Amino acid sequence: MDNTALKEKRYVGVKETVIYGIANGGQVIGYNLVRMQLTFFLVTVFGIPGTAVSLMIFIMGIWDTMNDPIMGTIVDKTRTRYGKLRPYLLFVPIPLGIATILFFGGAEFLRDVQSTAAKIVYMCITYFIWEFFYTIGDIPFWGLSAAISPNPQDRSMAITSARFISGIIGGLVGPVISVFIDLQKSGKIGIDMRQLFFILGIVAGTFGMALFSLAGICTKERVIQNSEEPKISDCFKCLFKNKPLLLIVCSNVLGTVESIADTFTQYFYLFTLGKASLSIIAGIPGTITGFLAYTFIPALEKKWSSKQIIIRAVIVKAVVSSAIFFIGIKWYRQPTVIVPLMMVWGVFNSVVSSIKMVIPTKMIGDTVDYMEWKTKERNEGTSFSLLTFVSKLTGSLATAVSAALIPVIGLQQVNQDMVLPENGEINTRFLLWAIVTIIPAVLNLLSLIPYAFYDLEGEKLDNIHREIAARREEITKSASAE
């Protein structure tokens, strides 16, 4: 099969593509609560010391270095009539939903408990359970993006659908919490932050997991798999032979610092500008353009390779973020100046974020094809376990660093509230301005270093797709003849 025919033959319809996206939308309600609000929830709402949170996240990071690759190899060894990925997606939504409710209900369940040790124990146990089941669901889900079709365009559309729809559904978490903070401080509502997070946990654990279950119920695996069950040792060997995948992983790790801004954005609007809900106003243009950005990703893929798109996106973000920082450096406490600036910044930031939500995931699918071409074995589970691991690792590192930075930049925890003492020696408001704009974006340029050695693109990648397509045809013909 020539490369043109391979690209033109489509296997996945619009309905299945949309359902795959809706499933991811359900999954990320709980994930975004953890990724964006973990420090705020555990330190400010639950009342757990930041040092304990940082230590737990560090230990969980060590656990993930073993847990994720092991889960990936288990997935790659799975052979059932439902495929090797879908069985996990059929099973995991129920236990993951229960774990989500238990974790975010902790502050409410232990409302009258004074023992910090008891809170820490509850936090560690429930977070471990949540991480465990999240891994069981996340690795097969993203592995499915490479197995849903042999056509790279189908895969790109499935990933784009997942990122687009999850951005809409999961993106509601931040604004809901920002509005609630302002309503609570003004005395307009009668529930507190503990109850809010419990309610959000229930929504994520029931409605969110109901949507996530659609991934196992309504999708198909279409890429032909070797019927022989590989050894766990072989899966690990393939992982370390996959140079393009390891380069993508290194890039993601180096880009960890970019996520720090997520934690401090809430504090910036609350303490520097005086109103948390201003983040919603500032975020409106970016939200719109972020969704629109998904529509022109196919056009970018026609013009540039995936590697070229990523390099350009990271550089643009660094340049724009630096310009915004210096333009607003004299007025960083003036909402009338900063909110419009953050609107402009949000437009560029959201476009770059949309691109980075799709392209690297698609590139991991390319590395799975590369290893099939090189070894005749497909390792979606092992390969995408690294995506899950790195996603959690970078999130955990960012959260741990953020928790450690809170006292360093002058913020203090007083009972259940985060406060900013006036007349301190540290200009906390200015540091928050730098942390949400220039610092993460500039340091993120380090993530481009591994791409200098990445060569799985252009004619090389086209030849690989051509050769494995021919191999699959031969396997199909042989099976039919038998």
Feature roles, as predicted:
Residues 2-482:
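Membrane-embedded alpha-helical bundles of multi-pass transporters/translocases
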